[in-house]
Amino acid sequence: MKKTFYHYMMKHRAALFSNEISNLAEAMYDDLSFPKQSEDYDEISSYLELSGMLESMSIFDEAWDLYIQDR
């Protein structure tokens, strides 16, 4: 069974050492409108761009690459 991107990112919450990916995971957790069931890069990328959640989309790209490697 595939994990959604949201589910994958939740393992990065409350990291011992805070970093950009753990901060993104916390922001996703706090955002009740985040598309939690999505596995689609374009849908999640568009959502993050429109929400202004990130200063740089390269943070999402890095997290997405880790997600794809883990699948």
Curated annotation (Swiss-Prot):
Superkingdom classification of source: Bacteria
Q: What Gene3D superfamilies does the entry give?
A: YozE SAM-like (1.10.150.260)
Please report which protein family the annotation says this sequence is part of: Belongs to the UPF0346 family.
Q: What is this protein called?
A: UPF0346 protein BA_2302/GBAA_2302/BAS2147
